[in-house]
Amino acid sequence: WIQQHTPDDISGGYSESLSDMIVDSRETLLRVLHYPHLTGHEPTGALRAAAHEDINLITILPSSNQSGLQVKGSDGRWIDVPEGDDKLVVNIGDMLQEVSGGYYPSTTHRVINPTFAANKPRMSLPLFLHPRPDVRLSERYTAASYLEERLRELGVK
């Protein structure tokens, strides 16, 4: 869907189609994130996961069973992502921002304490779609070199 709705002058710069970039990738991963229920002493709106962007191409996640996920709009305001069984959230990652030359900016997002039903735990199942390490993201980076640099910046490597 993203590839189909990308202007030709942008997608023409891709080294290969987005769907081909993830074929046979061993970097793609599914995570199970559990946020325990709140005790009632935590302030509403306090951070559970600080604002960040994902390193990968695209993150796909079914909407959580609990509110709290927010995305940062282009105006700098935080927008609540609705929860519900029939919703799917798609976040643009840093690698797609790189491969698109900034046409698709990374989705800045965070998780805050819910305003209601805080006695329920929050579950999230993000699927982080990564390209194969050999995929050329830009003149400057392959997927492997980009990931390595970002992990060093984060102090993970």
Predicted feature residues:
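C-terminal flanking tails of non-heme Fe-dependent oxygenases
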Residues: 1-157
